[in-house]
Amino acid sequence: MENLARRLDLCQEQLLELYEQNSKELQQHILHWKYIRYESAIYYTARQMGIKHLGHQVVPSLDVSKAKAHAAIEMQMCLESLQNTEYNVEPWTLQDTSQELWLAEPKKCFKKGGKTVEVRFDCNETNAMHYTLWTTVYVQVDDAWTKVKGQVDYKGLSYTVHGCTTYYVDFAKEAQTYGKTNRWTVIVGSHVICSPSTIEEHGLPIVETADARPPTTATDTPDAPATATTETVGPAQAPPRKRRRNGHLPITTTVGKSLGGEYVDTADRTRTPDPESNNGHRNCGGGSSTPIIQLEGEANCLKCFRYRLGKVSHLFCNSSTTWRWTTESRTEKNAIITLTYSSVQQRSDFLAIVKIPKTIKHSLGMLTLM
């Protein structure tokens, strides 16, 4: 027992050192999963011997240790095969090589640079869902890794390998769950992908995401056919967010020409963009804006969920206590928790990895301090 406890301490010390180093080298993340495998093997052996505590730590059940060891072996082997490619010189974070991201759609692929895509079902702004479009996807085909760009079109989110396109989010299936009319509008950055009738008339444009190119600006091309248009979204472009004020971001439809400083919504109304907005971010002079997610639900459910978020504390900056509105006219009993983020990108990564329970409603917003 003492021998197992000593080995467990050494293994966990190595894990803590790796967490503190916060390395961006792929080899270090291979070591991370190797030590997790060792840790699970020690727990498994201890449980087989009838030991339920090693030091101050509770020994998990055999099934839990076995499942965790299998997951660690899978991650270690995949990272070792990736290490033997030209992609080993790229920066890789602990989050990039996490099991949560590995199992997020598209599953069993490494991915980087998540961007938020808003889909308005029934073309209704109040009936919108957000999905993650990955800038870069690393796909393993026949024991070889291929680096491809994520794509979005009216059908869904996809990537293409050797001419074969794989959709990992199908908007038609999503519309069966969230919509009623089997119609939807896709918004990515400042681009809008329109209704099926428009797509059938003009063809199906694709918006690609670039992995290392600077963002490009769409220009008016009235003489060019819409089917020849391919828009590129640069990695520095902020993911879209729902605007609650009168101002709107300039939007460019993929089947038409850029409208410059105006935005045309699904009801063909023309609005002028907010003069304070700049590429999706508000420029407040002396103030600053912080991306937030507001969680609303039953108080105990929120507290339990906040406790579980401690395991992924690297995905957000701060969490508030539970609070409520005190307006006398409100009879709402639900409590609220506010999470803050260092950037819109971090918030997108949070939504891509963390599964929010159905009993908890969440809203995206910006907290501005003047």
From Swiss-Prot:
Chain spans, region Disordered: 212-255, 268-287
Modification after translation, per record: Phosphorylated.
InterPro entries, A to Z: E2/EBNA1_C_sf (IPR035975), Nucleotide-bd_a/b_plait_sf (IPR012677), Papillomavirus_E2_C (IPR000427), PPV_E2_N (IPR001866), Reg_prot_E2 (IPR033668), Regulatory_protein_E2_N (IPR036050), Regulatory_protein_E2_N_1 (IPR042503), Regulatory_protein_E2_N_2 (IPR042504)
SUPFAM superfamilies, A to Z: E2 regulatory, transactivation domain, Viral DNA-binding domain
Region of interest: Transactivation domain: 1-200
Ranges of Low complexity composition bias in the record: 212-230
UniProt KW keywords: Activator, DNA replication, DNA-binding, Early protein, Host nucleus, Phosphoprotein, Repressor, Transcription, Transcription regulation
GO biological process, one term: viral DNA genome replication
Span list, region DNA-binding domain: 289-370
Family to which the UniProt record says this protein belongs: Belongs to the papillomaviridae E2 protein family.
HAMAP family associated with the record: PPV_E2
Descriptive protein name: Regulatory protein E2
Organism annotation: Human papillomavirus 40
Organism lineage: Viruses, Monodnaviria, Shotokuvirae, Cossaviricota, Papovaviricetes
Gene: E2
